[in-house]
Each structure stands twice: as structure tokens, then as C-alpha cells.
Amino acid sequence: MNVLTHKAFNLVPWRVMGAVLILLAASVISASAQSTAFQLDPAQTSVKFTLGDVLHTVHGTFHLKQGALQFEPATGKISGEIVIDAKSGESGSGMRDRKMHKEVLESERYPEIAFRPDKIEGAVASQGKSSVKVHGMFNIHGVDREIAVPAEVEMAPDHWTAAVHFTVPYAKWGMKNPSTLFLRVNDSVEIDLVAAGTVAKQTAISSAQ
């Protein structure tokens, strides 16, 4: 074996190793560029509210209008919107609901309640349950407010669920407290959202987009 042949032979392992490293790097970049699309199903999603007064506790519901989210696990960045039909709110009492829509929510003027998340704090496991905190903008009564809410997320290959509980200090946020002289109502309302839908893996075209 001449000198040139010997040198070329010695370079082969390094070339193979270099190719392996390039493939590994490419796979890491591809994984980090992958995003997950969450579609919310109105039939499987529930929005409940609880409001207390001096006599009893009022329980009611709202309906999901639409919802779609895009999540990047590598960065925790999330985008999209969850939209609730404000006009769908009901508590089982027609008189109370009419007052809620006319005086508190003003749902004819502000027909939607929306949450636009922008960041997830904590890791979301690709399978099973995870406890995270979701940051974003919550819009109610025509005003955006920044909130951070704890969420319990459960992932499966083709579907997902998330349970969120948070408090809306509606009176502090400028909405009317429906209290009367003889019936005092709490200044805040408890919200329980259980969202569910489908999952789809996607690959981002460019991190700059």
C-alpha cells in the first residue's frame, strides 16, 4: 500500500463519522422545527362558570364557537385562538340570564370571549399527562388582559384533552356586578374549561416565519 492509498484509507472512518454527525444534526433540527396543531371540537369541549351569592351558588355554561392552536414543543411557543360564544351563556334562569347578557356581559355588543395563548411554561409530554402553565391574552367585554393559567394536558397519538380552571374578576375588570339591595353577588366568577380535539404533527418551513 503506497502512502497516498494509506492516507485515503485512514480518512474513510472520519468521513463515515462526519456523515453520521451530519445526519444526527439534521434529525435534531427537523425535530426542533416540528410543531403540533391542535383542533378543538365544540362537541367535546365544555365551558362552565360558577358564581356565588349570599343565598346560593349559580352554575352555568357557555359554548365553544371555534378553536385552533399551533404549538412548538422545542420553544414552548403557542399561537391560535379559542373563541367562546358569549351569547350562549345560560344558568337555568331566563330572568337571570337576560340580566347577565344585558347588564354584565353586554353580549349583543361583545358577542365573543376569546383566549389567545402565546407561551406554555413547562414540558408537554408526547404521551400521557402533563401539568403546565399557559400564558396569553384573554379578551372579554372588548378588552384584552394578560393572564397565566394552570392546565392539565393529556396527549394521545391522535387526540388531546386539557382542563383549565381560573378566576375572572369581572367587577374589577369594569363589568357591572348584578347585586341588588337584598342579594349580594361575588365580584369574581370561576371558570372551568375542558377542551378536547384532534392532534396533527407538522413541520415548520422556516423558523423565521
Describe the function of each predicted region.
Residues R15-V28:
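Bacterial N-terminal signal peptides
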Residues H6, A19-V20, H165, P178:
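Intrinsically disordered, low-complexity regulatory segments enriched
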